[in-house]
């Protein structure tokens, strides 16, 4: 059997903390956190004793918490100064999110998202003022991104551009998210769940292959997979972009080599499930989004997330993981195998005890 598991929240704790901010020349930490805080759907409130409380996506709350604690930037006050006029919400295809805010009589588009995707849409970088993004500077950003990812950090890039007026009609990514100025990289740690490494060892002991599937950078995914012993010597990692160029027949032949799938979209999950099934394996697949529903349906065991899962994902799944924890799937397999074994034993016992009566009945 094979368990294809999401990384964030299932293999990790989904409690992100900003631990590193990189910018060109190291002088634009505050600007990077400002963009990450404004281009953000987190709700910031305060308890009676004045302590801050955040509600929202853990990646986004990490930005708001870091900006508040380390730089004194309160999201609520910032939004009064620069209210959000409109937005292009995040989606897993673009891997970007953009918001537009008034600034100095013009408007500023603030963008955050996957660094490799974001960098490709930038034409300048914030250094000593705005500088053209040369190949040398782009390489600096790529190297900093790789260095953070190798430390198992989830990395997001921040960029902006100024426009004279908000575009009329429907906002498009081509119009808003191009010709940007790159500001910096923000690295966050999302520690693995304590119990997962033991659960992975139990998987291997039971003849089950754990596979990690994530939207994160390949180096980040591999670093965490190695820590959990999912990625072993001889294993390979592949990105969604590489999968796009790989025919399904080839994936079916090569699927056993891959322990980590990075920058993967929900459509890729379906292909991975079918490839494993072609190899004669029983496949369990986890998912939480609306787009995960087809893969959950196709998998032999679709596991929807009980905490972060959408109603659509839960409806398409065979089982709901109430605590979103990988170790719980392994315990469920253990319990299921125990029940199956007990049923077999009961049937053997009844047949062996009553064989005389059965023969008499048929004679």
Where are these regions (language model features)?
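Conserved cytosolic headpiece of P-type ATPases
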Residues: 1-363
């Amino acid at each position: 059997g094979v368990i294809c598991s999401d990384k964030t929240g299932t293999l990790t704790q989904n409690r992100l903390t900003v631990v590193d901010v990189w910018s060109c020349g190291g002088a634009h930490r505050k600007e990077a956190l400002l963009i990450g805080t404004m281009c953000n759907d987190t709700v910031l409130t305060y308890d009676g004793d004045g302590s801050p409380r955040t509600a929202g996506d853990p990646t986004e709350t990490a930005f708001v918490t870091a900006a508040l604690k380390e730089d004194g930037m309160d999201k609520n006050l910032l939004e009064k100064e620069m209210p959000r006029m409109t937005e292009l919400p995040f989606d897993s295809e673009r891997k970007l999110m953009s918001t537009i805010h008034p600034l100095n009589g013009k408007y500023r588009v603030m963008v955050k998202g996957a660094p490799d995707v974001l960098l490709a849409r930038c034409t300048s970088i914030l250094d000593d003022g705005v500088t053209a993004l040369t190949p040398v500077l782009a390489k600096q950003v790529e190297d900093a991104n790789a260095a953070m990812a190798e430390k198992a950090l989830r990395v997001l890039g921040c960029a902006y551009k100024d426009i004279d007026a908000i575009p009329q009609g429907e906002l498009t990514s081509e119009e808003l998210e191009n010709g940007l100025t790159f500001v910096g990289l923000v690295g966050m740690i999302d520690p693995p769940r304590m119990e997962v490494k033991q659960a992975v060892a139990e998987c291997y002991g039971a003849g089950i292959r754990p596979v990690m599937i994530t939207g994160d950078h390949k180096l980040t995914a591999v670093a965490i997979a190695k820590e959990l012993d999912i990625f072993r010597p001889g294993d390979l990692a592949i990105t969604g972009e590489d999968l796009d160029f790989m025919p399904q027949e080839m994936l079916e032949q090569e699927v056993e080599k891959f322990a980590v799938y990075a920058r993967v979209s929900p459509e890729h999950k379906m292909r991975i499930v079918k490839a494993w099934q072609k190899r004669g394996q029983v496949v369990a697949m986890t998912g939480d989004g609306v787009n995960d529903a087809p893969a959950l349906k196709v998998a032999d065991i679709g596991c929807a997330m009980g905490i972060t899962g959408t109603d659509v994902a839960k409806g398409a799944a065979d089982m709901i993981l109430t605590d979103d924890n990988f170790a719980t799937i392994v315990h469920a397999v253990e319990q299921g195998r125990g029940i199956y074994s007990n049923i077999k034993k009961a049937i053997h016992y009844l047949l062996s005890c009553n064989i005389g009566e059965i023969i008499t009945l048929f004679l």
